[in-house]
């Protein structure tokens, strides 16, 4: 699972996930990509499930880049616990995703196979996303 090796602080505040992505919003190395259309939060299990779906469909022919990393700790109190007694322990690691953020990139296969594989991967993610190419990446969400 993806998670930081060490952090300066164990827990973080929730924060807000507003606006559009400015960083990570354009293709860096690949020819095809999966771009977020709406805001959401992705955890390490969802990233791994999508990555496995991608690699199995392309049968390891393509080069795949994961452009997101869950570095925000999410805490959760156990069931049937009364309020108070401090902030709960870290349950999982997540990353806030803004619209326009590139999630996965892919190169080395034709567009049809890449579209099929990335469509399989987008069904594993908890927010709407779309397939983009180098030519179509600058379109409005």
UniProtKB/Swiss-Prot annotation:
- Alphabetical list of Pfam families matching this protein: Ribosomal_L16
Keyword RNA-binding included in the entry's annotation: yes
Q: Name one GO cellular component term.
A: cytosolic large ribosomal subunit
| InterPro entries listed in its UniProt record | Ribosomal_uL16 (IPR047873), Ribosomal_uL16_bact-type (IPR000114), Ribosomal_uL16_CS (IPR020798), Ribosomal_uL16_dom (IPR016180), Ribosomal_uL16_sf (IPR036920)
Q: Which domain of life is it from?
A: Bacteria
Q: Name one GO molecular function term.
A: rRNA binding
Query: Tell me, which GO biological process terms does this entry list?
Result: translation
Q: Which SUPFAM superfamilies match?
A: Ribosomal protein L16p/L10e (SSF54686)
Sorted alphabetically, the keyword list is: Ribonucleoprotein, Ribosomal protein, RNA-binding, rRNA-binding, tRNA-binding
**Assembly description:** Part of the 50S ribosomal subunit.
Q: What does this protein do?
A: Binds 23S rRNA and is also seen to make contacts with the A and possibly P site tRNAs.
User: What PANTHER family does the annotation carry?
Assistant: 50S/60S RIBOSOMAL PROTEIN L16, LARGE RIBOSOMAL SUBUNIT PROTEIN UL16M
Say which family it is in: Belongs to the universal ribosomal protein uL16 family.
**Name under which the protein is recorded:** Large ribosomal subunit protein uL16
Species for this entry: Campylobacter concisus (strain 13826)
């Amino acid at each position: 699972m993806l998670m930081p090796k060490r952090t300066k602080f164990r827990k973080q505040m929730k924060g807000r996930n507003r606006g559009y992505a400015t960083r990570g919003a354009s293709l860096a190395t690949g020819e095809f990509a999966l771009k977020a259309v709406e805001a959401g939060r992705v955890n390490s299990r969802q990233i791994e499930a999508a990555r496995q779906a991608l690699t199995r469909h392309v049968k390891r022919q393509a080069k795949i880049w994961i452009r997101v990393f869950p570095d925000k700790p999410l805490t959760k109190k156990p069931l049937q616990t009364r309020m108070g007694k401090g902030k709960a322990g870290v349950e999982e690691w997540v990353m806030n995703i803004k619209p326009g953020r590139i999630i996965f990139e892919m190169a080395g296969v034709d567009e049809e196979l890449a579209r099929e594989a990335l469509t399989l991967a987008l069904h594993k993610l908890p927010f709407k996303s779309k397939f983009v190419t180098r030519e179509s990446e600058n379109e409005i969400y």
